[in-house]
Amino acid sequence: KVGGLDAIIAMQTPAGGSMWSLVHPIGHEFGWISILTGVVILGIHGHCTDQDYIQRVLSARSSYHAKMGAILAAFLKILALFICAIPGVIAAKLFADMGLQLNQDQAYVSLMIEVLPMGFLGLALAGLLAAIMSSVDSGLCAASSLITIDFIAKRDKSAMDQDKMLKYGRYTIMALLIFAILWAPFIQKFKGLFNYLMLLWSLLAPPVVVSVLAGLFYKKANSKGAVATIITGIVLGIVGFIMLQRPDIFNGIISFFGADGFSVRDDFNWYFLNKFNVGFLITVSCAIVMWIVSEKTEQTAEELTQVEAIFKARKSKDDQMTPQETKKYQYALI
C-alpha cells in the first residue's frame, strides 16, 4: 500500500529533510545540541534512574542477574525502532497517499485498523491494551511505594505494619489513578501526547537524575543536598514550564524585575524555547546545588553508615560473578 521499503526509506518531512535523519539544525525541536544534551538526560532517567527500573534491579537475585536483566532490557529497547518508529512513518506515508489528515496520537491504532484483518486486529489491540496496562500498573506501584514508604511511614510509625502499609498503598494508587483521570482532558491542550510526555520528563527528570547518580557515585552526597536538589528542580521546572508554554507571562515577570523589552521568543528563541535544552540547564543547576549543599553540610551518622555500606559492597567478594557468569556477561555485552 505504501510502495515498499524504498518508499518508506525515501520519506521526507514537510521541510524537505529525510524523516530518518538524526541531524537537524540548532533551532529544530530535535536539533543536534538538544540530542547531545537534553535527550541524553531523558535517556539516563528513563532507563537508569527511574523508580520502576531501580526496583527491578534491587530485587534481582544477584549482581549477575541484575546486569543480565539490564542487558536484556537494553536489547529489547532496540526493538522500539521497529515497534514504534517505523509504524509511525508507514502511517504518515499511507494516510498522506490517501489524502487524509491524521492525528499523530491516533496513528498506531488507525494503522492497525486499516491494514490488519479482523482476527489479527483483535489480537493486536488486546496486546496493545495489555502493554498499556502493564506500563500504568508499574508506574502506579512505583509511585505508591515511594509515597507510602518515604512519606507516610516516616510520619506514622504504625504504618510500618505490613497490613497498614498495604492499605495505604492501595489508597495511594486509587488517589493517583483518580488524579490521572481528571488530568487526562487537559493533555489535548498540548501538541500531542508524545510532546506532552517529553515536556514533563524534560522538566521533572533532572532533579531525580542528579539525586540518584550523586547517591551512587558521590561519596559526600547527603539528604540535605538531595532535598535541596529536588526543591531546586521543582522550582526551575515550574519556571521552565511557564517559559515554554506561556512566554508572554514569563516576559512579563522578567519585565517586572527591571528587564524591560526582554522577550524569550525574540532574544533566545533558538535555545530557550526547546524543552530539551531547558531540561539540560535544569540538570546542570541541580548538580551545582547538590555539590554546594553536600560540601557545606555534614552527613548524619546513619548516612555515613549507608555510604560506607554502599562503597564496601562494591568491593565485596560475596556477590562477585563466577568465571562462568563473567564470561556470559562479557559475551552479552559484545
Question: Residue locations for each model-derived region?
Answer:
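Membrane-embedded helix-loop-helix hairpins and adjacent transmembrane boundary segments
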Residues: 1-334
